[in-house]
Amino acid sequence: YYEALAETGKYNTKLETSLLGTVPDREMWANSLCVLECNAFYNNTDNSINMIVGMMGSPFYYSDMPVEELYASLGAFWIGHEISHAFDSNGAQYDLEGNLNNWWPEEDYAGFNARVKKMDEYLDGILIMDDYYVNGSNVDSEMIADMTGLQCALKMAEKEENFDYAVFFEYYARMNASVS
């Protein structure tokens, strides 16, 4: 296993090095991805949301999924979260074509950065354990994505009759739970 992993790394490095100085091929599949992986991501260099096929099964998605679970999983946890990365601390620096180019009006960008700074300061005060605290600037992009994804899903929920918020939040919590 280790040898195969090392050879894959060498191949990827050689491929990426060969592409230096060339015009980016926006149709080229990112070579670091595995189609069986359970993941989704926003790629700021081509302004795309990518959902790997491994996540398109239970518990993330199944055909008779109640709308509350669907909104919690695909709405908040996956799609809403990933779309918002286009507008987080990193994504905000890239334009429509994926070029590193600040496209925001100066006043909007300053306001955005002021809000991010306020969030970072709040997060910096959270004790993890003993004398270890969260470093807000290390997690702000993911926090923005989580909060925005949740807001998007809740906005959709407002339009649903008899939406069960308890089911929604329980499923959302399960999507975020981990054992360590």
Please describe what each predicted stretch is:
Residues 1-78, 82-180:
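Intrinsically disordered, low-complexity linker/terminal regions across diverse proteins
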